[in-house]
């Protein structure tokens, strides 16, 4: 989960998120260099004694400041497209879970496991125990195995919602009447948090998502059924 | 930064981090510190060298800034390429170790197949 006043990305829990962090570092370095150049140009503009305002016919400069941004955009676009197509790769998921957004909770269906269905409500502050996270913890977590490709089918029963888990690099809109699909493979066990990411009414901020990722051996023993 | 495990707590990580222009975290971004340092060195060498030859201050500053950008970019791509290669090698090594642990002693053990074919 994010710590207080965190600005940067959370640590990665899936290979796609690792790639996204690498791309983010790459884009940020290019942005830093562009900002540095612009700040220097601004400094020169503010400290020059030259005041000629009718400069014209600077073909070389115009060529440079057209070609250079095009090259920069290509340098950014190529890795971006690579990751975009990587997220759409079909990787033969081990099983499928359906996530349905409601106002203001999530319903999860484990149809591969005998039709287990449960709701996941945020824990109200009065029901929090010491160590629980305010506005993040839920009554029933989504329990999943580590290192197994999982397919999430996401939809909504009423208005638009969005199922997001930042550490996995996931954000998929829950649209009524439409079934969106996303797949992921978690690389390490733990409890990971996300929040609804599409404005959906008064309690939009109070319908979090909690994934509990456990080793496959323990998952197969069936703890997810003990509700 | 990248990687699931960091030895420092988030608060400690924040105290140690230096953010250039307020957003580029050079401590926690792989290759950033290395690139910026070499870029600064390149900028100083290029700018000062140009000044020694031409005695033009303004143009030397421009050469210094240009040198910083080019050297930083060059070091950055070189370092990131090697970093990506290293990550791929680590992943291959991890997979091979996992396979070895799983298949050692079984009929699927690649070493047993190799030894069997060489003895024949």
Swiss-Prot record, chain A:
Cofactor needs: Cu cation
GO-annotated cellular components: mitochondrial inner membrane; respiratory chain complex IV
Membrane keyword on record: yes
Enzyme Commission code: 7.1.1.9
Catalysed conversion reaction: 4 Fe(II)-[cytochrome c] + O2 + 8 H(+)(in) = 4 Fe(III)-[cytochrome c] + 2 H2O + 4 H(+)(out)
Pfam families, alphabetized: COX2, COX2_TM
Keywords (A to Z) from UniProt: Copper, Electron transport, Magnesium, Membrane, Metal-binding, Mitochondrion, Mitochondrion inner membrane, Respiratory chain, Translocase, Transmembrane, Transmembrane helix, Transport
Cellular compartments annotated: Mitochondrion inner membrane
PROSITE patterns from the UniProt entry: COX2, COX2_CUA, COX2_TM
Mitochondrial matrix side: 46-59
Chain positions recorded as Cu cation A1 binding sites: 161, 196, 200, 207
Ranges that cross the membrane: 15-45, 60-87
Protein name, per record: Cytochrome c oxidase subunit 2
Origin organism lineage: Eukaryota, Metazoa, Chordata, Craniata, Vertebrata
Gene that this polypeptide is encoded by: MT-CO2
């Amino acid at each position: 989960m994010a710590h207080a006043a965190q600005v940067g990305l959370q640590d990665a829990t899936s290979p796609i998120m690792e790639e996204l962090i690498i791309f983010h570092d790459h884009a940020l370095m290019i942005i830093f260099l562009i900002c540095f150049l612009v700040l220097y140009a601004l400094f020169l503009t503010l400290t020059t004694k030259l005041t000629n305002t009718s400069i014209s016919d600077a073909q070389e400069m115009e060529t440079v400041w057209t070609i250079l941004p095009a090259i920069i955009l290509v340098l950014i676009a190529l890795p971006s497209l690579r990751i975009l197509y990587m997220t759409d790769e079909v990787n033969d998921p081990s099983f499928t879970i359906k996530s349905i957004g409601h106002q203001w909770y999530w319903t999860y269906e484990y149809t591969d496991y005998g039709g287990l269905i449960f709701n996941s409500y945020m824990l109200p502050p009065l029901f929090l125990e010491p160590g629980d996270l305010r506005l993040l913890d839920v009554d029933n977590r989504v329990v999943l195995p580590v290192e197994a490709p999982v397919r999430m089918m996401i939809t909504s029963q009423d208005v638009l919602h969005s199922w997001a888990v930042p550490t996995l690099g996931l954000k998929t809109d829950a649209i009524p009447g439409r079934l969106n699909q996303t797949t992921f493979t978690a690389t390490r066990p733990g409890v990971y948090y996300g929040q609804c990411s599409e404005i959906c009414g008064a309690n939009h901020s109070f319908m979090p998502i909690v994934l509990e990722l456990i080793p496959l051996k323990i998952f197969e023993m069936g703890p997810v059924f003990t509700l | 930064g990248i990687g699931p495990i960091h030895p420092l707590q988030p608060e400690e990580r924040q105290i140690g981090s230096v953010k250039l222009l307020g957003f580029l975290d050079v401590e926690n971004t792989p290759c950033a510190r290395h690139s910026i340092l070499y870029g600064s060195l390149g900028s100083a060498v290029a700018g000062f060298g140009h000044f020694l030859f031409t005695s033009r201050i303004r143009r030397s500053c421009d050469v210094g800034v240009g040198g910083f950008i080019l050297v930083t970019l060059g070091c950055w791509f070189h370092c990131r390429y090697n970093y990506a290669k290293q990550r791929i090698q680590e992943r291959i090594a991890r997979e091979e170790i996992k396979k070895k642990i799983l298949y050692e002693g079984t009929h699927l053990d690649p070493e047993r197949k190799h030894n069997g074919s060489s003895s024949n």
